[in-house]
């Protein structure tokens, strides 16, 4: 599985996960690329709950990604703490779709 990151994701992941935690996330997604729930109206963009440092999945991180099934690739789009926001706004979803050209 090939992982491609947006610049925003790269900036945020370095602040929210250490190398081992990020490797564990990538391993999980490589084994279970459909693990995240598809965000309605997103064209297939998924949201995965992920435990952050010292937190469980429910209060941890939200990983936003897109699984390119035919390309065996995952685009890592956005990452945020649940305490920052519950869900992506419709505008955020629209921008992510445009970035992927879906």
Language-model segments: residues:
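Arg/Lys-rich, positively charged N-terminal/basic patches that mediate binding to nucleic acids
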Residues: 1-20
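Residues that recognize and position ribonucleotide moieties
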Residues: 2, 46, 86
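A short, surface-exposed loop/turn module that caps and links secondary-structure elements
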Residues: 27-57
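Short polar/acidic secondary-structure junctions
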Residues: 53-55, 66-69
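Short, surface-exposed coil-to-beta transition loops
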Residues: 59-63
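Enriched for short, Lys/Arg-rich terminal
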Residues: 67-102
């Amino acid at each position: 599985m090939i992982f491609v990151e947006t610049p925003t994701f790269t900036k945020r992941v370095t602040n929210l996960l250490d190398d081992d935690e990020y490797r564990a996330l990538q391993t999980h997604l490589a084994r279970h690329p459909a693990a995240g729930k598809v965000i309605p109206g997103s064209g297939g963009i998924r949201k995965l709950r992920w435990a952050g440092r010292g937190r469980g999945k429910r209060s941890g991180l939200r990983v936003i990604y897109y699984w390119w099934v035919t390309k065996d690739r995952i685009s890592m789009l956005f990452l945020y703490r649940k305490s920052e926001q519950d869900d992506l706004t419709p505008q955020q979803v629209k921008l992510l779709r445009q970035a992927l050209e879906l």
